[in-house]
From Swiss-Prot:
Protein name as catalogued: Large ribosomal subunit protein eL31
Coiled-coil blocks: none
Entry keywords, A to Z: Ribonucleoprotein, Ribosomal protein
SUPFAM superfamilies: Ribosomal protein L31e (SSF54575)
Source species: Methanococcus maripaludis (strain C7 / ATCC BAA-1331)
Length: 83
C-alpha cells in the first residue's frame, strides 16, 4: 500500500545549534531523522532536489524550512522537494 504525505521540515534548530561550517550536512541528517520519526521507517531515499535546495546558498546559509513530498512504498520512503 502506497502512502503519500507532504511535510514542512523546520531547519531553524540546525542553524542555531551548528557551527557555520557544518550546517548543510547536519540539515540533511536532520531531514532524514525527521522522516524516520514521522514515517516510521529506517530506509530513507532523498531526491537530489532536496540536496540541491539545502546546498543552494553554500554550506552555511541553509533554508529555514523545506517542504517535502514523501511516498512510502512498503519499507522504503522516497522524498522529493515540493516546488
Amino acid at each position: 500500500m502506497e502512502e503519500e504525505r507532504i511535510y514542512t521540515i523546520p531547519l531553524r534548530d540546525v542553524t542555531n545549534k551548528s557551527p557555520t561550517t557544518k550546517r548543510a550536512p547536519r540539515a540533511i541528517r536532520a531531514i532524514r531523522e525527521f522522516l524516520k520519526k514521522h514515517m516510521k521507517s529506517d530506509i530513507i531515499k532523498l531526491d537530489n532536489s532536496i540536496n540541491e535546495k539545502v546546498w543552494e546558498r553554500s554550506l552555511n546559509k541553509i533554508p529555514a524550512k523545506v517542504r517535502v513530498k514523501v511516498v512510502k512504498e512498503g519499507d522504503v520512503v522516497k522524498a522529493t522537494l515540493v516546488e
